[in-house]
Amino acid sequence: MSRPSSRAIYLHRKEYSQNLTSEPTLLQHRVEHLMTCKQGSQRVQGPEDALQKLFEMDAQGRVWSQDLILQVRDGWLQLLDIETKEELDSYRLDSIQAMNVALNTCSYNSILSITVQEPGLPGTSTLLFQCQEVGAERLKTSLQKALEEELEQRPRLGGLQPGQDRWRGPAMERPLPMEQARYLEPGIPPEQPHQRTLEHSLPPSPRPLPRHTSAREPSAFTLPPPRRSSSPEDPERDEEVLNHVLRDIELFMGKLEKAQAKTSRKKKFGKKNKDQGGLTQAQYIDCFQKIKHSFNLLGRLATWLKETSAPELVHILFKSLNFILARCPEAGLAAQVISPLLTPKAINLLQSCLSPPESNLWMGLGPAWTTSRADWTGDEPLPYQPTFSDDWQLPEPSSQAPLGYQDPVSLRRGSHRLGSTSHFPQEKTHNHDPQPGDPNSRPSSPKPAQPALKMQVLYEFEARNPRELTVVQGEKLEVLDHSKRWWLVKNEAGRSGYIPSNILEPLQPGTPGTQGQSPSRVPMLRLSSRPEEVTDWLQAENFSTATVRTLGSLTGSQLLRIRPGELQMLCPQEAPRILSRLEAVRRMLGISP
């Protein structure tokens, strides 16, 4: 038999390699299944409790293990018999909620715990495996990669149909390039008057962004806790804000991509990179704030969007967030961005639709990203008011919110302290003269000066355009015009603007604050603040003693206009958090740095 030619060998090798690469990834390893723990019992509340249970059983010699094959195929995590290859159990890859590794903790030295949602059953279970051959760390990494590939390779289809299971079928979509997406444009289908049609038109992105369409039903509207605000909801305005927020995020990503390319060219030609392509720390902070603000907007719009769902946009934002974090020059900068805190609706939305890798990314950002306003135990963050690169401003707020989209406070109009008509009798109109012969007409005489109407803020409100006014809970305001649902008010700093009337309550005579006392529970920073007031503000914000000593000698004007580079030199450890706080104060006061 003659030896095959070199060309024949090459062609056979080429065909062999092409066949291998065209086949779906098949992960298959031999493991030892130790036990499965149902979570939610009195002793097992999470993966750590399951491991502790294993340690106890191992010490007592009660572990009944079984060797088997752990395999990933066609989007399923399968447990197979070693000899017959019979399927013993299986779970959807996207039902995996967490994976943890425990090394050298007992007689089993390489344990992988996988927490999954049981198919068709409520609650979760934790499976424990001894990974002697492959190693728990390596197997965890392989499973995470398989899960990411599975999420990316789903066919791009429409949203979930009624009755369609969230995790089965083609509901999850493959990554959608940003150049194929469009921005929101309001449009109400006639057959569904309370649903919105959402379209996107985003500029080209350096990376494709994933899409996802599953979401759970939103919870019923409830009155927010007294210490936090629930901004009156107007979906059309929220859509407009979201449009511009997403556009600014994309613009920042484009700048980041250009900066990265510039850095690569400098490295190629041996030049030193002295900057980040013109991107400042404040720009990174602004982008992180806008991403958080987007989550809050999507939480409010979750039941309003139709064709493009809120979870789809959440996945787009997380892809963008991952892209930005990978290129951020300061690793912990995002975790220090506190304002704006997420709303409970935003938290619920993220919990309902994030994939395991996205959930890990989210949790890794810390409490400032994972704690809702209602559960935040730190210092009260200052209100967040976004500014836009194109100087776009919102139109005047509408007088009524659409049906099905009323704000939580307005749903409680039965309370006598809420509502625009329950505070005091409405004034009579004076837009005409008395009619001749009217027995009630009397010669006009100067009217005594009416005392200024004082109100107290029940819930904080963030201004969304120059016509509105940012207020905080407990602030005392003077009402200038209360003829409409949105009232014109003036704060003690002399700034005036519109706020919704249903976040106010009457200020009774003799209430502290009626004589010009400070309306805030914490010291306020203003341009006119003296050094001792700046010191009080820094201490109230829980900055370190060194920071208070360094910056406490400045006036409010000096601190609010300090440059990021100067602040970095003076307070290198806390500069990011100080910048974030100062930016929030600037927005509230309506000043530029």
UniProtKB/Swiss-Prot annotation:
GO terms for cellular component: cytoplasm; plasma membrane; ruffle membrane. InterPro entries: EPS8-like (IPR039801), EPS8_2nd (IPR055093), EPS8_PTB (IPR033928), Eps8_SH3 (IPR035462), PH-like_dom_sf (IPR011993), PTB (IPR013625), SAM/pointed_sf (IPR013761), SAM_3 (IPR041418). The keyword Phosphoprotein applies. Keywords: Cytoplasm, Disease variant, Hypotrichosis, Phosphoprotein, SH3 domain. Transmembrane segments: none annotated. It is found in: Cytoplasm. Residues 450-509 form the SH3 domain. Residues 149-171, 184-239, 374-451 are annotated as: Disordered. Residues 28-155 form the PTB domain. Residues 425-435 have a biased composition (Basic and acidic residues). Residues 386-401 have a biased composition (Polar residues). One of its GO terms (biological process) is Rho protein signal transduction. It holds the Pfam family PTB. GO terms for molecular function: actin binding; guanyl-nucleotide exchange factor activity. CDD domains: PTB_EPS8 (cd01210), SH3_Eps8 (cd11764). The modification Phosphoserine is found at residue 231. Interacts with ABI1. Part of a complex that contains SOS1, ABI1 and EPS8L2. Interacts with FASLG. It is linked to Hypotrichosis 5: A form of hypotrichosis, a condition characterized by the presence of less than the normal amount of hair and abnormal hair follicles and shafts, which are thin and atrophic. The extent of scalp and body hair involvement can be very variable, within as well as between families. HYPT5 is an autosomal dominant form characterized by little or no scalp hair at birth, wiry and irregular scalp hair in childhood, and sparse or no forehead and parietal hair at puberty. Eyebrows and eyelashes are thin, and pubic and axillary hair fails to develop. Belongs to the EPS8 family. This is Epidermal growth factor receptor kinase substrate 8-like protein 3. It comes from Homo sapiens. The lineage of its organism: Eukaryota, Metazoa, Chordata, Craniata, Vertebrata.
